[in-house]
């Protein structure tokens, strides 16, 4: 109880001392400031969300998952040991999103105490209790991950390939936490980088880039999946190659609720995807994945 009281006092001091102004900044700046504050105050692996930051609080005797909104309100605080269990060792926070049906989806990197690295997806109720969990082995070549809720208590999980950057693994979890399907996604002869997974009702819209320097193909791709693993809509836009600019990734603008392409030059600038010219959608491969592929 004493440690929890100390954390509350720290929050009050930070707010009253005006270390940064929450009222005078837009949401993006507030979240950036909040993320900086969390990193300075014993919070590891801070993850940006639409209206909140999730992080691991290491100040107490036991690590806690904490979600704080952009007005410094703590909306979730739960000890990792309450749901990770004793069979695994916590390694890192890989993702955290609010479930559109209520609660939270949290993705952790785990170390099985005697075996290979694992990934754990946990569905938490609004009070932090664990509704279901799915822990599976994580092969090294499947790197960063994206999460999207399906609005029914289930979720989509996207793994990006990091050894050749040409493939993504997509899986869907039912409201009971069962894997309903797994599919690999790739484009013929193109490097595919998925950047954003957004909930669209019960569907997920995946945003990424499909690029080939040799073929002079530089496209953003937008793919909408339903809960049965079917593609229901696609769109491609051409961002070309503009002088010394190059597109590094697609980001989500919280203010406009739209996807933007981030360009890198001597300074950063962005352009809404909607302002890029439409083009033919590239040849896509979507393959059911054998259950032995994790």
What are these regions (language model features)?
Residues 69-71, 125-128, 173-178, 225-229, ...:
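Short loop/turn segments that connect beta-strands within beta-propeller blades
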Residues 62-66, 118-122, 167-171, 219-223, ...:
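A short loop-to-beta-strand structural motif that recurs across blades of beta-propeller domains
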Residues 8-16:
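Bacterial N-terminal signal peptides
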